[in-house]
């Protein structure tokens, strides 16, 4: 990878993340690389400016923060095919980030990138849009939204906690009509997030699939379902007379859903590309460490338990 132009996003409001971002910018500029840098957070979205200001192809996005900062980068940069190196600086769980200890010697990191001494993890993304009109000839309304974890169709109100009636169709066939708090349509990457909390299955991120999970359904027979990645999911919010239904992408508000509109969800045409610096990466070890599964309490040397 030749680093001619790099964007650096640091966690908004986190001093250590900003300090490391400035240090990385100086080092890359000393190597003749053009750098665009800015904060990323709830009130800060630097990516439209990054993409509009780039004078040439963006070779790398360096993200210094946690999983939330990484999700924002994936939503905006993956459709452009920009690889992401995400490092846990100020994050919490760090499911999607490289550990900070592999980023201590940053000069060595730049050398490794220039010498192509890294791996790339491809993570499936989802796309969603609003549609209205006839089922056989639907018209897209507004823009297309992307997510790395999940699309969530859920009502929101200032003064109460409304439930939803949601009808779901897959590839033109009715699946179920849920009365629930909301509905999740997730990727394998997102299966360890909101979907897992809603009693959905955990899927390996190396596979492509879509998980549909109702949130707190009133019927005990309403269960999560895993469908092929090429499936088209259509979601109709019903009986929303107070106009509360919203589409959320990775926990961020995307748009409101009006009566007569449906949400279409499908696999995005491009996957998120994450740079891996660790020489050994195990998804199962990540589950043990981050979710504190029982296996994390014991150390093994080969087949023998150490303690």
UniProtKB/Swiss-Prot annotation:
It is found in: Cytoplasm. The active site is at residue 67. It catalyses: NAD(+) + ATP = ADP + NADP(+) + H(+). Keywords: ATP-binding, Cytoplasm, Kinase, NAD, NADP, Nucleotide-binding, Transferase. SUPFAM superfamilies: NAD kinase/diacylglycerol kinase-like (SSF111331). NAD(+) binds at residues 67-68, 149-150, 160, 181, 192-197. Disruption phenotype: Insertion mutant shows a strong decrease in NADK activity compared to the wild-type. Under photoheterotrophic conditions, mutant shows a greatly reduced growth rate. Under photoautotrophic conditions, the growth curves of the wild-type parent and the mutant do not show any differences, and mutant shows a metabolic pattern similar to that of wild-type. Deficient mutant accumulates glycogen under photoheterotrophic conditions. GO terms for biological process: NAD metabolic process; NADP biosynthetic process. Its main location: cytoplasm. Involved in the regulation of the intracellular balance of NAD and NADP, and is a key enzyme in the biosynthesis of NADP. Catalyzes specifically the phosphorylation on 2'-hydroxyl of the adenosine moiety of NAD to yield NADP. Essential for photoheterotrophic growth. Has a significant function in the oxidative pentose phosphate (OPP) pathway for glucose catabolism under photoheterotrophic conditions. Is also involved in cellular redox homeostasis. This is NAD kinase 1. It comes from Synechocystis sp. (strain ATCC 27184 / PCC 6803 / Kazusa). The gene is nadK1.
């Amino acid at each position: 990878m030749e680093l001619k132009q790099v964007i650096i996003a640091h966690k908004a409001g986190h001093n250590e993340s900003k300090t490391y971002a400035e240090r990385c910018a100086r080092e890359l500029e000393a190597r003749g690389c053009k750098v665009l840098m800015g904060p990323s957070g709830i009130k800060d979205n630097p990516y439209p400016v990054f993409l509009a200001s780039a004078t040439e192809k963006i070779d790398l996005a360096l993200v210094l923060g946690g999983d939330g900062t990484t999700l924002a980068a994936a939503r905006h940069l993956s459709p452009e095919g920009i690889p992401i190196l995400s490092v846990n600086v100020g994050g919490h769980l760090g499911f999607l980030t490289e550990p900070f200890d592999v980023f201590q010697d940053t000069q060595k990191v730049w050398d490794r990138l220039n010498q192509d001494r890294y791996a790339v993890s491809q993570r499936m993304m989802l796309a969603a849009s609003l549609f209205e009109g006839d089922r056989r000839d639907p018209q897209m309304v507004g823009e297309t939204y992307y997510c790395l974890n999940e699309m969530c169709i859920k009502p929101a109100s200032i003064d109460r906690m409304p439930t939803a009636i949601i009808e779901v169709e897959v590839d033109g066939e009715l699946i179920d009509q849920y009365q629930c708090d909301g509905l999740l349509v997730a990727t394998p990457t997102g299966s360890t997030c909101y979907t897992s909390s809603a009693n959905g299955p955990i899927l390996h991120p190396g596979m492509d699939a879509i998980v549909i999970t109702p949130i707190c359904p009133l019927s005990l027979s309403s269960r999560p379902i895993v469908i092929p990645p090429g499936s088209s999911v259509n979601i109709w919010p019903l009986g929303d007379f107070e106009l509360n239904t919203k589409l959320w992408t990775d926990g961020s508000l995307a748009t409101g859903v009006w009566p007569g509109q449906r949400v279409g969800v499908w696999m995005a045409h491009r996957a998120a590309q994450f740079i891996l610096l660790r020489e050994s990466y195990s998804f199962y070890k990540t589950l043990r460490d981050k979710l504190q599964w029982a296996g994390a309490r014991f150390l093994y040397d080969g087949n023998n338990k150490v303690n």
